[in-house]
């Protein structure tokens, strides 16, 4: 009996000791640096062998931070020059003539999107606060920007989308971002035409409407939730006031007050492009510029004036209506059950089921159209031309070409290849 009691006591004591050692060990490991410092214990020893070992694995070619920054800005602008996509250019609306007068419309013109969300958002505030704004970028390219309209948009921040931030120097800018859950509120309020000053009706060679949207990791869109300030559509379609401005710009164009209407798409997301060919708006040119970085607006000016020929191609399929995109069905504000019990700092609790698999974008549109034409699969009725506004890989250029077929050579070999000899000539 005594033996059993003694064994039980020993087991209990050992259990307590093991528990203390486990917990104590974890605490000690977590605070090892502080404990070693307090006890004066060093866990490392530097042995100098007398040999010289290079400490820089990648030697810099720049002599200062300023020189490094200038080089990175040059790369940024070169990337924009080669990446911008000319989607529409009726009657050679672009490039604009040297010294052309332009008016910038939409609050987005003064709250341009320079950086994205998620991993790139760490420096968004710094990039945005120090970026070259659109007016300065166009002015540097020789364009004459309507100062009165620009200043009005700058002063009326109640029409800005996103949060208005004032930096230490008193400069205001906007940050457009969501929160750590799907369905973040995105606003496309902008200013209606009736609120604009008389400067909006100034004579100009071109009216440039800026459409900015921003989202991504940590700032997901919920397509089934209308954006604040919109009576129809969603955040990736034009808002009511943006459409109102376009309608009135067409009126000014018909009256001869402005020469042409240009739309800049300032977004990395797939905007609905139903507006581009809508006769109610009279849009002459559409230029996709993406998210431009700190100095990308300089490149926009050079493309608009023809100093640089746009040669980019779309990396996505753009739809007239995003409801025709199969991923639309899986977008929304889906949350894990009981996710609200998590601390706010860890409430990334949204999820999406990618039930469309790889069949999104061009993989979906091209496959379904092929099946429809060939009468195979389960394609149903499908009108490609009424669904896709701009396909994957699309992009125009200011350059025009004439081609001539010089001959055809057929080779009888294992790959049964055919060679076409074609002469291409630049005509402008």
PLM regions and their residue ranges:
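C-terminal non-catalytic regions of proteins with extracellular/luminal or membrane-system context
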Residues: 1-428
């Amino acid at each position: 009996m005594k033996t059993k009691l003694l064994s039980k006591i020993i087991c209990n004591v050992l259990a307590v000791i093991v528990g203390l050692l486990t917990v104590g060990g974890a605490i000690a490991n977590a605070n090892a640096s502080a404990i070693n410092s307090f006890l004066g214990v060093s866990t490392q020893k530097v042995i100098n062998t007398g040999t010289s070992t290079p400490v820089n694995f990648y030697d810099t070619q720049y002599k200062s931070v300023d020189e490094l920054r200038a080089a990175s800005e040059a790369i940024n602008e070169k990337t924009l020059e080669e990446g911008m996509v000319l989607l529409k250019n009726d009657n050679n609306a672009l490039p604009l003539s040297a010294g052309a007068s332009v008016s910038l419309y939409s609050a987005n013109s003064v709250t341009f999107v320079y950086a994205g969300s998620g991993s790139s958002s760490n420096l968004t505030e710094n990039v945005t606060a120090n970026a070259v704004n659109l007016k300065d970028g166009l002015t540097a390219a020789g364009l004459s920007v309507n100062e009165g309209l620009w200043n009005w948009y700058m002063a009326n921040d109640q029409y800005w989308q996103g949060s208005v931030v004032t930096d230490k120097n008193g400069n205001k800018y906007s940050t457009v971002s969501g929160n750590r859950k799907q369905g973040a509120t995105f606003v496309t309020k902008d200013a209606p035409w009736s609120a604009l000053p008389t400067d909006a009706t100034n004579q100009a060679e071109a009216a440039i409407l800026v459409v900015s949207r921003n989202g991504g990791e940590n700032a997901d869109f919920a397509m089934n939730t209308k954006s604040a300030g919109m009576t129809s559509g969603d955040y990736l379609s034009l808002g009511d006031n943006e459409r109102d401005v376009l309608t009135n710009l067409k009126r000014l164009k018909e009256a001869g007050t402005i020469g042409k209407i240009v739309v800049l798409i300032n977004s990395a997301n797939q905007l609905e492009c139903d507006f581009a060919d809508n006769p109610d708006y009279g849009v002459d040119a559409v230029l996709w510029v993406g998210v431009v970085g700190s100095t990308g607006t300089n490149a926009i000016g050079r493309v608009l004036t023809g100093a640089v020929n746009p040669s980019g191609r779309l990396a996505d399929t753009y739809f007239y209506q995003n409801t025709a995109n199969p991923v639309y069905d899986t977008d929304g504000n889906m949350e894990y059950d009981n996710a609200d019990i998590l601390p706010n700092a860890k409430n990334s609790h949204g999820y999406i089921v990618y039930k469309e698999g790889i069949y999104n974008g061009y993989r979906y549109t091209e496959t379904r159209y092929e099946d429809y034409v060939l009468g195979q699969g389960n394609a149903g009725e499908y009108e490609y031309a009424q669904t896709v506004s701009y396909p994957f890989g699309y992009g125009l250029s200011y350059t025009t070409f004439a081609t001539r077929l010089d001959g055809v050579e057929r080779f009888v070999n294992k790959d049964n290849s055919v060679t076409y000899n074609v002469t291409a000539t630049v005509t402008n």
